A protein has these predicted regions:
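N-terminal membrane-proximal hinge/A-helix region immediately C-terminal to the signal-anchor transmembrane segment
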Residues: 1-96, 111-124, 143, 155-159, ...
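Cytochrome P450 I-helix active-site segment
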Residues: 5-10, 114, 118, 219-226, ...
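Conserved cytochrome P450 K-helix E-x-x-R motif and the immediately C-terminal K′/meander segment
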Residues: 17-36, 291-332
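Conserved cytochrome P450 K-helix/beta-meander segment immediately N-terminal to the heme-binding cysteine loop
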Residues: 66, 322, 344-371
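Cytochrome P450 heme-thiolate monooxygenase catalytic core
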Residues: 70-75, 93-94, 109-261
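Short, small-residue alpha-helix embedded
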Residues: 258-271, 403
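Cytochrome P450 heme-binding "Cys pocket" and the immediately downstream C-terminal segment
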Residues: 274-276, 373-375, 393-429
């Protein structure tokens, strides 16, 4: 006899859709508190199973990964944006693309990127005046776009930066889980969907313009874009410009926003915890002095590392991930039907008191070697895990640390909001602009 996981029955037909739309974060927390680590419910007509225990998560992402694909839920939501890019592609095609692109994120390449990251950060900070109030999350989104454009695609985004940032923001907002329209087909002409369609057209125009401009160059840099174009132009492959477009969209939309959020949440957390901030600043002074940070400095900055780790635990930019079972499966003592959508929320696991004492408090000092060794493998997974872990994990962590270090060398950040609140879009977005006053140090 099949034993389904426990969970809320919700309303007839709608199931738990309305409570999830109203507040997905509280809903996740309530499910975990009331029903445990494995919870089944109905959302928008789909069987959803929340899995929130490290042991089960490891089975899904590693041990039994072949039985859990990306699935129709993610394809319905994201297929328009990233097509067959790395995020959604599967099987042999995914393996080939992953192997093709992975070298661009090896240590040798990252070392070359580091100087560009610091240069772009200093250029952005040059626009700030001591005593002024800035919208930190917006500034950092512009910065990470500029860094990504220069390091991975070899072009200066300055002229199109504002348009590109607005386009990316509009696309992300289309997937705010707290809006009913998110669960409607993209072709339905709601105001949000119309804005989304315009943004998608803008995205495609920018990407194809970048491809055309690169092909017209006589001497182009050896970067991610060059690797992609060479693969498409190779007669031995079946890749097309549409493949190229999908991978560029995946990297841009998947990379710049999560990094900007990690930076935002690290800087605001430090601003609200003066003791932790003082420790990081003292470490930067001791190791760097007045020098710019380099990639070789990062191992000597453990307090900076802990500050970033703790911010990504407390406010994980990727707050959940999804899989779909491609056959009936057993998770723990429960049966999961074929075609169920699994939601695996970092939001719940990262705030679980079984793994993290005082889980809702920012405590970077918790990140000792002994503590990390004691953690279950998937109690902390800000970059997903298994063979499909984020391809840009090293790039994103290095970028976040270099940017935070560079900015702290120049400014103090006075957080202007009483506290952060969040919106569940493609990533963990601030519900309102993050205003900070910057003061030179």
């Amino acid at each position: 006899m099949s034993t389904l996981p426990p969970g809320p029955s919700g309303l007839p037909v709608a199931g738990s859709t309305l409570s999830f739309v109203r507040d997905p974060f509280s809903t996740y927390e309530r499910w975990a508190e009331e029903y445990g680590d494995i919870v089944a419910t109905n959302i928008a007509g789909r069987t959803f199973v929340m899995v929130a225990h490290p042991e089960h998560i490891e089975r899904i992402l590693v041990t039994d990964q072949q039985h859990y694909g990306k699935g129709s839920f993610q394809r319905d939501q994201l297929g328009d944006i990233v097509g067959d890019g790395l995020l959604l592609s599967e099987g042999e095609f995914w393996h080939e693309q992953r192997n093709r692109l992975q070298p661009e994120f090896f240590r040798e390449q990252l070392t070359q990127y580091a100087t560009m990251m610091v240069d772009e950060t200093r250029a952005r900070a040059d626009n700030w005046t001591s005593g002024e109030t800035i919208t930190l999350n917006s500034e950092l989104q512009h910065l990470t776009l500029a860094i990504m454009a220069r390091t991975l695609f070899g072009f200066d985004i300055e002229d199109a930066e504002g348009q590109f940032a607005n386009t990316a923001r509009t696309i992300s907002e289309r997937f705010n889980l707290s809006h009913v329209s998110t669960y409607l087909a993209a072709w339905i002409p709601t105001p949000r969907n119309r804005r989304y369609r315009r943004a998608m057209n803008n995205l495609d125009t920018v990407i194809y313009d970048v491809i055309e401009a690169r092909r017209a160059q006589d001497d182009s840099p050896n970067d991610l874009l060059a690797t992609l174009i060479a693969a498409v132009d190779d007669p031995e492959t079946d890749l097309t410009d549409e493949t190229l477009r999908d991978e560029i969209a995946t990297v841009i939309l998947g990379g710049h926003d999560t990094a900007a959020l990690a930076m935002t949440y690290t800087l605001t957390a430090l601003a609200r915890h003066p003791d932790a901030e003082a420790e990081v600043r003292a470490e930067l002074d001791e190791v760097l002095g007045d020098d710019d940070p380099t990639v070789t400095d990062l191992p000597a900055l453990p307090r900076l590392d802990a500050a970033v780790k703790e911010a990504m635990r407390l406010h994980p930019p990727a707050y959940t991930l999804f899989r779909e079972s491609n056959r009936p499966m057993k998770i723990g003592e429960y049966d999961v039907p074929e075609g169920a959508t699994l939601t695996i929320p970092q939001w719940v696991v990262h705030h679980d008191s079984r793994w993290f004492e005082s889980p809702w408090e920012y405590q970077p000092d918790r990140w000792t070697d002994e503590f990390e060794a004691s953690l279950p493998e998937y109690a902390y997974f800000p970059f997903c895990g298994g063979k499909r872990h984020c391809i840009g994990m090293r790039y994103g962590l290095m970028e976040t640390k270099l940017v935070v270090a560079t900015l702290l060398q120049r400014f103090r950040f006075d957080f202007q909001l009483p506290e952060l609140s969040f919106a569940a879009a493609l990533t963990l977005q601030p519900a309102e602009p993050v205003s900070v006053r910057v003061t030179t140090v």
